[in-house]
């Protein structure tokens, strides 16, 4: 087994009407928790790391862990660079073995976003690395990324069509009303906008900010063409909440083999639910 490009996973998902879950990782325990469930449920998976992730644990260490677990669990997996903003940073990580990258130029005007994404696509495609980009701007907070409500805006379908044609990007993250983090007010997803984007864009579509989104809403986006669903905040909350509860019951506890496993088990329940919502159970061939 090996680390593969997300292109192959997403093409199959698009052809067969399901979505591939993309879970953000932070350390060995989070990687292991996610893959234990994906292996059991035979679900394809994308392990996503933000620039902050790779400051906490070196890319080479994460890559080695993922490669080892791919063999242990007998399943291919994709290691994905989430919300990266620099071609030089992506170039270095691709040369180290990563085969999936998101270049986030959504904070730039359209022409500058196109120029940046096209430069990344040209390089990555020469290395069999797939590229995701974002058009529109999600609000909220994820790791070191913070976007206030005034700076957020939704994806225009016709601009999305032009963007994909001009850049050659492999998948497109669309802004349709979700946000990074948890929701402080009523969530309103623009399903009609998503349907209009799907009509004019033929590459796989990506839903960012899927934490705290009702399951039926996520399923509806998949019906309308989303093939990659990103989950981050819910995983961290489950892990941290379980560890806090363990220490509340075991104030003298100090053995990470116990409290880390409690956190992992809580995270696994979130992973299990998201796989079911994505419809990706048994989508890995034996």
UniProtKB/Swiss-Prot annotation:
The active site is at residue 82. It catalyses: D-tagatofuranose 1,6-bisphosphate = D-glyceraldehyde 3-phosphate + dihydroxyacetone phosphate. Homotetramer. Forms a complex with KbaZ. This is D-tagatose-1,6-bisphosphate aldolase subunit KbaY. The keyword Zinc applies. GO terms for molecular function: tagatose-bisphosphate aldolase activity; zinc ion binding. Keywords: Lyase, Metal-binding, Zinc. It comes from the Bacteria. Binds 1 zinc ion per subunit. The keyword Metal-binding applies. Dihydroxyacetone phosphate binds at residues 181, 209-211, 230-233. It comes from Escherichia fergusonii (strain ATCC 35469 / DSM 13698 / CCUG 18766 / IAM 14443 / JCM 21226 / LMG 7866 / NBRC 102419 / NCTC 12128 / CDC 0568-73). Catalytic subunit of the tagatose-1,6-bisphosphate aldolase KbaYZ, which catalyzes the reversible aldol condensation of dihydroxyacetone phosphate (DHAP or glycerone-phosphate) with glyceraldehyde 3-phosphate (G3P) to produce tagatose 1,6-bisphosphate (TBP). Requires KbaZ subunit for full activity and stability. It is an enzyme of class 4 (lyase). Its cofactor is Zn(2+). Pfam families: F_bP_aldolase (PF01116).
């Amino acid at each position: 087994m090996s680390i593969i490009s997300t292109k192959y996973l997403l093409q199959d998902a698009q052809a067969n009407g399901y979505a591939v879950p993309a879970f953000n990782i932070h350390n060995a325990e989070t990687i292991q928790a996610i893959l234990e469930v994906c292996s059991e449920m035979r679900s394809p998976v994308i392990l996503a790391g933000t620039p902050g992730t790779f400051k906490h644990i070196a890319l080479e260490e994460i890559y080695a862990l993922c490669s080892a677990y791919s063999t242990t669990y007998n399943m291919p997996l994709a290691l994905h660079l989430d919300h990266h903003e620099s071609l030089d940073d992506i170039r270095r990580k691709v040369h180290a073995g990563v085969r999936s990258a998101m270049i986030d130029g959504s904070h730039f005007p359209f022409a500058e976003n196109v120029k940046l994404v096209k430069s990344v696509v040209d390089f990555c495609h020469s290395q069999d690395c797939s590229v995701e980009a974002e058009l529109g701007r999600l609000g909220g907070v994820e790791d070191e990324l913070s976007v206030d409500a005034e700076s957020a805006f939704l994806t225009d379908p016709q601009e999305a069509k032009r963007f994909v044609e001009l850049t050659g990007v492999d998948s497109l993250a669309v802004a349709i009303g979700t946000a990074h983090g948890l929701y402080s007010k009523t969530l309103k997803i623009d399903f009609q906008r998503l349907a209009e984007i799907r009509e004019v864009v033929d590459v796989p579509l990506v839903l960012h900010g899927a934490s705290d989104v009702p399951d039926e809403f996520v399923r509806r986006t998949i019906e309308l063409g989303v093939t990659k669903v990103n989950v981050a905040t819910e995983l961290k909350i489950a892990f941290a909440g379980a560890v806090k509860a363990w220490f509340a019951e075991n104030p003298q506890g100090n053995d990470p083999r116990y409290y880390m496993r409690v956190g992992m088990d809580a995270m696994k329940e979130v992973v299990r639910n998201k796989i079911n919502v994505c419809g990706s159970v048994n989508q890995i061939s034996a």
